[in-house]
Amino acid sequence: MIKIRIKFRKYGVMRFIGHLDIMRYFQKAMRRAEIDICYSEGFSPHQIMSFAAPLGVGITSDGEYLDIEVNSTRSSEASIKALNDTMVEGVEVTEYVKLPDNAKTAMSMVAAADYDLYFKEGYEPAADVRTFADGIRQYFTEKEEFLITKQTKKSEKVMDLKQLVYAFDVSERDGRPVFYLKVST
C-alpha cells in the first residue's frame, strides 16, 4: 500500500460544487484515469481517500489536498496527466506525490489557510481604495479582540476571532480592495 498526496485547484463553475460531490467526482476520476486505488473491506467497499479541510461552496482554491492509498503507481507526471485528461474545466491536479509510510494525514498537516476576499462587484466602498484600506488596517490593528458568539446545538460559546488571524492586510488589485487573511483552520 502506497500513500499519495494530491494537490488540486478548483475554479470557475466548479466552485459551486459541494464537498461530497467533489469526493464522488474524484472517485470517478480515479477509475477513469486507471489509478490503482485501494478499497476498504466489508460489504460496501469504497475508495480510500480523505480530503484536508474541504472548502465551502462558492470558494475557489489554488491548493486543496487529497490523500489516497494505492496498490501501485506510475510516475507523478503520468498520474497527473491521466487525472487531468479525465477532469472537466474547473478542476486541475497540480501535484501527485508519494509519501513515506509514517507521513501524517493531510488533514492534520493543514494548520492555516490563506484567503483573498473581494467585495461583490457593485458593492465596493465609495471611498478611495487606499483611504478605505488604511482605515480597515488601522481598525484591525487597534482592536484588541473580535468577539463573536458561536451557537451550537447544545450551547453558546464566546470566541475571539482575532486570535485565529495570523496575518491581515488590505491592498488594491485592479482598482478594487482585496483583503488578505491567513487564518487558523
List where the protein language model places each region.
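Glycine/small-residue-rich interface belts in oligomeric ring/scaffold proteins
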Residues: 3, 12, 17-65, 76
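Structured-RNA-binding interfaces characteristic of tRNA pseudouridine synthases
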Residues: 37, 48-185
